[in-house]
Amino acid sequence: MTDPRIIVAIDTFDLKKANAIVDQLDPKLCKIKIGSVVFNALGKPFLQEIFHRGFKIFLDLKLHDIPNTVHETILGFHDCSIDMLTVHLSGGEEMLKKAMLAAQIIKTQVIGVSILTSLDESDSLNLFNNSLNDQIVNLFKLAKKIKIDGIVCSPLELEVANRILDSHTIRVTPGIRDIL
């Protein structure tokens, strides 16, 4: 069986609604994405329930903290059978290395978030003293250096990603469609 390429986000913290969405899905066809709002509301038991229903889990918490905290946070998911989880590439080389080490232990993939799509050119200049495109290039180069498992990026960044990253690096691009 091939790995599902579609990732469906559960974006409700109402357990009944979340289960109603999951009930409509087939684990052979998609993975389930759980973001921070849903995770904070429903916690590990919901992750474990989704896993036991046969789904691969994409935990989108966008971790960004000191290296040891990110490492320990990832290790804390050892009992959740997570397929992929996100960290911010802007957390830096040491944080990413520690994330990768922890991910190897719990057998998950680390997916690096480049630039949030809510940020624009002005934000990039203010935050990074760099143009948006140059910052994305820098982050993708860091991802390649660290040998991160994958990246999350805007579809508009795929051309740059394809130029910089290895062909085996996973690319996740968001698309939003309500199903309920």
Residue ranges, per PLM feature:
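Conserved anion-binding
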Residues: T2-D3, D65, T69-V160, I164-L180
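Short, structured active-site "lid" loops
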Residues: F51, F55-F58
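Glycine-rich, proline-tolerant flexible connector loops at the mouths of alpha/beta enzymes
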Residues: I32-L42
